[in-house]
Amino acid sequence: MGGVDFEGFRKLQRADGFASILAIGTANPPNAVDQSTYPDFYFRITGNEHNTELKDKFKRICERSAIKQRYMYLTEEILKKNPDVCAFVEVPSLDARQAMLAMEVPRLAKEAAEKAIQEWGQSKSGITHLIFCSTTTPDLPGADFEVAKLLGLHPSVKRVGVFQHGCFAGGTVLRMAKDLAENNRGARVLVICSETTAVTFRGPSETHLDSLVGQALFGDGASALIVGADPIPQVEKACFEIVWTAQTVVPNSEGAIGGKVREVGLTFQLKGAVPDLISANIENCMVEAFSQFKISDWNKLFWVVHPGGRAILDRVEAKLNLDPTKLIPTRHVMSEYGNMSSACVHFILDQTRKASLQNGCSTTGEGLEMGVLFGFGPGLTIETVVLKSVPIQ
């Protein structure tokens, strides 16, 4: 009696092609915040209008941020009902914050996911895996469980939670989705990132200017993607292929970006050296990623860069001698939404393909064949994703 052909079985489980992004959906809370008037609101709602010198400093930070507006769950009404959230670190507020997050993170995730599923055009019963990412939900079972329930996904959907990773995780989930899609023939992976500032919002402090900078940068948003290999002809349409991925920790960067969950919520630290640390290491990441494709002209690529702040984008652009047009989609998303942590790069991917179509480009990557996506975050960690565009027909 012949033995089981385990090798043949293993090969049958593998997809033939690269993982492809088959759909993208995004969502934001309805509350749009104008950056030009936010300093007045922020210092009034936190009871710090008397501190005019610090308020003027915050105004200058907002003016230099290159952000026009952001979307936030926290409205004046919500903050008035939860005054402890408006303190810096003087009073506990974690319970109040978590009560908000337990509702808002899954709700925003569901909205983005439904848009992605609608664009995909297939039954949600075809979703085999769920990767759920958030920096804001410590409950058990996790928000991945709640979102699967809200969407009515099949009980057998294989869930993975990516929690407490921060801003680089938009690249992390693409790396994970690639591995799942390419190693499980027929897999369709729903990837969701849902982030809200309800866990980090707090009043100003003269001794913690990094916290003040964060209050000027971050916004709320959720992204959702359908990822799968070997798109079904005439049924599914890829917008990008995920070709190669990597993660690296920047040397001598410990403590540059970090956060700690305490009774007062999630506090974060942002050192001023972050833009220089990223720009000093970005070229090594590019060489590692693209030498295998014999590409060394970075202007022949389309670019998706996590907008951790204006200074980071300026330093990366200068270090790599990028044409200013390369970061237009990235700067557009930063301007219109602020820093939405892990969800940002997916908003930029969506903007890139839409702008490519509107501008009459031949591919979803601004008429170019290949591109790069970068996520930056705590560690200091850099995620690198090599992408291939698809023709626009």
Curated annotation (Swiss-Prot):
<feature type="active site">
    <location>
        <position position="167"/>
    </location>
</feature>
<feature type="binding site">
    <location>
        <begin position="308"/>
        <end position="310"/>
    </location>
    <ligand>
        <name>substrate</name>
    </ligand>
</feature>
<comment type="function">
    <text>Catalyzes the production of pinosylvin from cinnamoyl-CoA and malonyl-CoA, and dihydropinosylvin from dihydrocinnamoyl-CoA.</text>
</comment>
<keyword id="KW-0346">Stress response</keyword>
<keyword id="KW-0012">Acyltransferase</keyword>
<comment type="pathway">
    <text>Phytoalexin biosynthesis; hydropinosylvin biosynthesis.</text>
</comment>
<feature type="binding site">
    <location>
        <position position="270"/>
    </location>
    <ligand>
        <name>substrate</name>
    </ligand>
</feature>
<comment type="similarity">
    <text>Belongs to the thiolase-like superfamily. Chalcone/stilbene synthases family.</text>
</comment>
<dbReference type="InterPro" id="IPR018088">
    <property type="entry name" value="Chalcone/stilbene_synthase_AS"/>
</dbReference>
<dbReference type="Pfam" id="PF00195">
    <property type="entry name" value="Chal_sti_synt_N"/>
</dbReference>
<dbReference type="Pfam" id="PF02797">
    <property type="entry name" value="Chal_sti_synt_C"/>
</dbReference>
<dbReference type="InterPro" id="IPR016039">
    <property type="entry name" value="Thiolase-like"/>
</dbReference>
<protein>
    <recommendedName>
        <fullName>Pinosylvin synthase</fullName>
        <ecNumber>2.3.1.146</ecNumber>
    </recommendedName>
</protein>
<dbReference type="GO" id="GO:0005737">
    <property type="term" value="C:cytoplasm"/>
</dbReference>
<dbReference type="InterPro" id="IPR012328">
    <property type="entry name" value="Chalcone/stilbene_synt_C"/>
</dbReference>
<comment type="subunit">
    <text>Homodimer.</text>
</comment>
<dbReference type="InterPro" id="IPR001099">
    <property type="entry name" value="Chalcone/stilbene_synt_N"/>
</dbReference>
<dbReference type="InterPro" id="IPR011141">
    <property type="entry name" value="Polyketide_synthase_type-III"/>
</dbReference>
<dbReference type="GO" id="GO:0050198">
    <property type="term" value="F:pinosylvin synthase activity"/>
</dbReference>
<feature type="binding site">
    <location>
        <begin position="57"/>
        <end position="60"/>
    </location>
    <ligand>
        <name>substrate</name>
    </ligand>
</feature>
<keyword id="KW-0808">Transferase</keyword>
<dbReference type="GO" id="GO:0030639">
    <property type="term" value="P:polyketide biosynthetic process"/>
</dbReference>
<keyword id="KW-0963">Cytoplasm</keyword>
